[in-house]
């Protein structure tokens, strides 16, 4: 499993407007329906009103490659340009071992 954190930063509320447009236009729902997509959610940092965090999770690199080759990417690129967003990306590959036993004591279930 591959998890991508995309930090979209803009000005004058552009990042939030971008995320809202992605949801209202149905693009976010279409991405969630793509084969191999496991998660696609936007979050808003309390201390940075001009940034939006997208957590995007995929089964494998092939699913990401198919997503990047889809016609949807042109829509996303156009919206990024419209709102003049800049991005920072973090990529995580899961090791599937779960949390170590010693860390579980800090987790309330």
Feature map (PLM): residue ranges:
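Short S/T/G/P-rich N-terminal loop/turn motif that feeds into the first structured element of a domain
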Residues: 1-52, 57-69, 81, 85-109
């Amino acid at each position: 499993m591959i998890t991508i954190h995309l930090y979209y930063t803009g000005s004058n509320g552009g990042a939030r407007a971008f995320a809202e447009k992605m949801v209202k236009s149905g693009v976010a729902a279409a991405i969630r329906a793509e084969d191999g997509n496991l998660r696609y959610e936007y979050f808003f940092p309390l201390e940075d009103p001009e940034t939006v965090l997208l957590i995007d999770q995929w089964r494998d690199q092939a699913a990401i490659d198919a997503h990047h080759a889809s016609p949807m990417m042109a829509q996303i690129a156009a919206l990024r340009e419209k709102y003049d967003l800049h991005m920072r990306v973090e990529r995580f590959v899961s090791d599937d071992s779960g949390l170590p036993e010693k860390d579980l004591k800090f987790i309330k279930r």
